[in-house]
Amino acid sequence: MTTTTGLRGRWAQGLQPRYFTWVIMDRLGAGERPGGFARNHRKVRRQEELIWLSVHGFTHIVSLLDSPHNLHAYEEAGLASVHVPLGPHDELVPRLEVVYATIGKLLDDPMEKLFVHHEEFGDRLLGVMGGYLLYAGLVDQGTHAISIIEKLTGRSVGSVGREIVAATLDEHLHR
């Protein structure tokens, strides 16, 4: 478990992950990979963001990264994690079903509070979050899912994210 012993004030609270957004209030949050992505990744920032997730009661981190990066850090911080690689674009549809089912199964427990991340807070993650709203039956139209995600994040969902939402509908992925 990450210890905040000796830390005072805002440092004991950690640092909110970059672009953190509630998709389902107090149950499902999303953001950039803790510590940042690729060359911008910083170990100290990752530790601060993991402290924030722990202090705020997150029970699982769902990593959509293709690689197992950060999983050891989550374990060291005492945060349970699930690695569900989103994979390359041409393998997306079969993987979406696994991603959605994993998130859904975790959220079936009312005590679960999830943080989902991809490498960066971009179209792929936004599309998956919009697709999950469809999968879970929280919305029934792709345009509604996209609109909600855009409103929550303050970002436009681009072509890749829209393709993910469309694939969720086209493949009839739902609970």
Please name every model-derived segment.
Residues 118:
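Conserved S/T- and glycine-rich ATP-binding loop of Class I adenylate-forming
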Residues 122-128:
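Glycine-rich nucleophile elbow surrounding the catalytic serine of serine-hydrolase chemistry
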Residues 1-115, 128-175:
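Cys-dependent protein tyrosine phosphatase-like superfamily
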